[in-house]
């Protein structure tokens, strides 16, 4: 009897222990990792804003949240998602397209078909700025006449260089025929002002301080090039990534006319195997609390439900798609997951 009692006691204790372990594991699994970028950019503070929102609005009632971590940016984030070291990540749209198709800088890793979209966050607006006397058409066709001209395409191996090359390739422009400079945004603006370069490519949220500075100094001596609808299609190269963006007149000093340019999304990505209900609740919470996010970081002021799926490069996670359908948003075929 004593042995039976002892075995029964041990059995109960083991069951309790295992139950506790499983519960702890389940709880840990619902503290999702959100990969961002370096702490000095926009990705990290926006990631912290999303994580803070989840801890305030979702953790108390629904028992899950996000924790933001810094990273080397979009390229590493795709790797972290693929290895399940992160369950959510902020990605540049082009890197999302490259990951999904196994192309570009991510070709070696192969197609990442476990990748899903949750929401567009804010857009990188393309500013192809050149000297006005070189802007004969006022559109990106003028880039075709810039052979041997000095042009800053962004820092080497940066997202700026990657997106610039992608766009120009679609337009039939070979940037390697330019006299290229590999400068950051501020340095590009300085070089344009002092005559070291004739043009620059700056994709960022509007208004961009570097472009503001260049316009304040040079006024109508420089011009942001327009994209026609056909040029937007060519720039996309089949990606459905860049969408129309109008820079209103007087956004920059001396910019008296609106500019019809294009923009690609920075977007919230997720693994396809994440719990549908969790992704649904996160998406719903984001759009019901935009004012909360706006108070933490100004980049989120560009977010709106009307723009939530603009330019997304990979199919939506079913949880996000469910929320958008509830809100009456029509989801195009290429964003519906198999």
Predicted segment positions?
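Bacterial N-terminal signal peptides that target proteins for export
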Residues: 1-11
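C-terminal segment of classical bacterial N-terminal signal peptides
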Residues: 16-25
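Bilobed "Venus flytrap"/periplasmic-binding protein-like clamshell domains
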Residues: 31-60, 68, 124-194, 306, ...
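Pocket-flanking alpha-helical
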Residues: 56, 67-109, 186-191, 206-215, ...
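Alpha-to-beta junction loops
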Residues: 82-90, 149-151, 194-202, 218-222
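A structural signal for short loop-to-beta-strand junctions that line the ligand-binding cleft
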Residues: 108-127, 251-259
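An extracytoplasmic/periplasmic, membrane-proximal ligand-sensing/linker region
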Residues: 187, 204-219, 224, 274-338
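C-terminal lobe and pocket-closing loops
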Residues: 216, 222-281, 323, 327, ...
């Amino acid at each position: 009897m004593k042995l039976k009692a002892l075995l029964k006691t041990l059995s109960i204790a083991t069951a309790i222990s295992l139950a506790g372990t499983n519960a702890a594991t389940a709880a840990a699994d619902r503290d999702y990792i959100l990969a961002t970028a370096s702490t000095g950019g926009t990705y990290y503070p926006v990631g912290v804003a999303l994580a803070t929102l989840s801890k305030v609005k979702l953790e108390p009632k629904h028992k899950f949240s996000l924790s933001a971590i810094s990273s080397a940016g979009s390229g590493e984030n795709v790797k972290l998602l693929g290895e399940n070291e992160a369950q959510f990540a902020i990605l540049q749209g082009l890197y999302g397209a490259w990951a999904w198709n196994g192309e570009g800088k991510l070709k070696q890793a192969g197609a990442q078909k476990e990748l899903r979209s949750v929401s567009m966050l804010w857009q990188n607006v393309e500013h192809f700025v050149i000297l006005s006397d070189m802007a004969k058409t006022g559109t990106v066709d003028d880039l075709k006449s810039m052979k041997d001209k000095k042009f800053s395409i962004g820092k080497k191996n940066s997202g700026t260089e990657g997106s610039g090359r992608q766009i120009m390739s679609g337009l039939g422009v070979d940037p390697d025929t330019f006299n290229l400079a590999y400068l950051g945004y501020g340095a590009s603006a300085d070089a344009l002002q002092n005559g070291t370069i004739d043009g620059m490519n700056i994709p960022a949220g509007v208004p961009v301080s570097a472009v503001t500075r260049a316009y304040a100094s040079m006024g109508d001596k420089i011009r942001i090039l327009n994209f026609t609808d056909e040029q937007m299609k060519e720039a996309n190269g089949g990606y459905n990534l860049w969408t129309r963006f109008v820079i209103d007149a007087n956004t920059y000093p001396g910019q008296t006319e609106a500019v019809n340019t294009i923009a690609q999304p920075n977007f919230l990505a997720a693994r396809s195997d994440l719990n549908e209900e969790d992704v649904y609740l996160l998406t719903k919470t984001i759009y019901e609390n935009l004012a909360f996010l706006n108070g933490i970081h100004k980049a989120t002021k560009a977010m709106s439900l009307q723009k939530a799926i603009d330019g997304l490069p990979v199919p939506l996670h079913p949880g996000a798609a469910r929320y958008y359908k509830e809100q009456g948003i029509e989801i195009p075929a290429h964003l519906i997951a198999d």
